[in-house]
Amino acid sequence: TLSPYRQEFVTLAIGGSIGTADEGLTAPVVMVKDVPELQSLPAGAVKGKIVFFNGRMERTRDGSGYGKAVRSRTEGPSIAGTLGAAAVVLRSVGTSQNRIAHTGTLSYNVTSPRIPAVAISNPDADNLERQMRDTAAGGKRAGEPVLLKVRVTSRDLPQTRSANVIAEIPGTDLANE
């Protein structure tokens, strides 16, 4: 973040995300939990802003929390782009507490503007959430915008030929015989 507190976040581009211009993109942040909350905002609420999807993945034994949380990553950038957002920052869809974000892919809707999308780790998302709360009504920095600068170097490359190697190492199928 550039303001109100200077803080560098570790980001990873979401698979399939477009990049930003070389100088990056700076804009105020709007925090939402998930896609339904984004869609419930008044018209123009995210125009030219960075949407921060802050929904936490629920830790479950069967992994069902992942399915509930992943929509913000897969569909969120297209929906935010349609609403006029400049970029998306996503709380990592995972429960790890290290500073390396979990990513995956997104699916741009062919009729929606494509905007850059990055993931940040849970600890970095916690810091950004605190900054958003500090600047909200009643916070100690109420009224100050949270400004983020995002720089994404992703780009589409032309298709090319590649190959996978599939092999069998003799003796591994029946190793004990």
Which ranges hold each PLM region?
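Noncatalytic luminal/extracellular "stalk/propeptide" segments of secretory-pathway proteins
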Residues: 1-50, 54-62
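Long, well-ordered, tryptophan-enriched scaffold segments
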Residues: 82, 86, 108-164
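Protein/peptide-recognition domains central to ubiquitin and immune signaling
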Residues: 1-8, 85, 90-107, 123, ...
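Second-shell loop/turn segments in exported
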Residues: 16-20, 27-32, 41, 61-77, ...
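Mature extracellular/periplasmic domains of secretome proteins
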Residues: 41-46, 75-86, 103-109, 172
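Catalytic-core environment of secreted peptidases
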Residues: 43-45, 49-71, 77, 92, ...
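Active-site-proximal beta-strand/loop segments in catalytic clefts of secreted hydrolases
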Residues: 32-35, 53-57, 90-94, 120-123, ...
